[in-house]
Amino acid sequence: YKRRNGDMKKQICLVMAAMMAAGMLAGCDRSAKETTAAATEAATTAAETAAEETTAKETTAASGEETEILVAAAASLKNAYEDKLIPMFEEANPGVTVKGTYDSSGKLQTQIEEGLDADVFMSAAKKQMIALDEEGMIASDTITDLLENKIVLIVPTGNEKKLEKFEDIEKADSIALGDPASVPAGQYSEEALTNLGIWDKIQDKVSFGTNVTEVLNQVAAASADAGIVYATDAASMADKVEVVAEAPEGSLSEKVIYPVAVVKG
């Protein structure tokens, strides 16, 4: 395949970001929809500007070339991308193939720094995006806050431990969390639990996962009594996990924002 660089790649990626925001919007609840709608509008405006009111489909057709876009996305987005968003985008844009690689945002940041040939980076937190931008590896004018997520406490279906609120994580005998060293969900978990005075009390019960999907899978398999993931993760396994509660208001210093941007070629 032929890989595009510069403005052409930028416009295709921005059109993709706008479409993916719109696709995610369809599956959100009302409050999330309002947040995502604003992000969709921002991404769409950026896409229209960069593309000079063309679409990725028209651009590709005009050149007659096949284009492959590699998206490096947070592990919590894998199901949404693979099951819905990528097929939706490819159907609307013949000649453009989208491949995804998924891991914790911290690990993806490191991979991009070490030469991963990604076209688009979608992080589960602003920290990793800011770091890459400061290193000159991101097209700064393409950074868009695309989605807002929620941090939730989950338990296996049945809730045998009878947890009722976020703070009840203390009652669990085994807990799955993302590793705060590289997993944004783990960083959010540490912050919330520290602010609630719980973090130090549960350390001997915690198993740390290398990405949020590992945490979700541990709870879904009942290998852990409880875990902390994103609301979107919990929704993807609603038949195997239950949401006990969202992180309490004030326990996190900022909203859980997923930024997206084009990686410099």
What is the predicted role of each segment?
Residues 119-123:
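Periplasmic-binding protein-like
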Residues 142-151:
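Short, glycine-/small- and polar/acidic-enriched structural segments
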Residues 23-27:
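C-terminal motif of bacterial Sec signal peptides marking the signal peptidase cleavage site
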Residues 10-17:
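Sec-dependent signal peptide recognition
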Residues 29-47, 51-52, 56-92, 103-106, ...:
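Exported/periplasmic ABC-transporter solute-binding proteins
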Residues 1-7:
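Short, Lys/Arg-enriched N-terminal segments with co-localized hydrophobic residues
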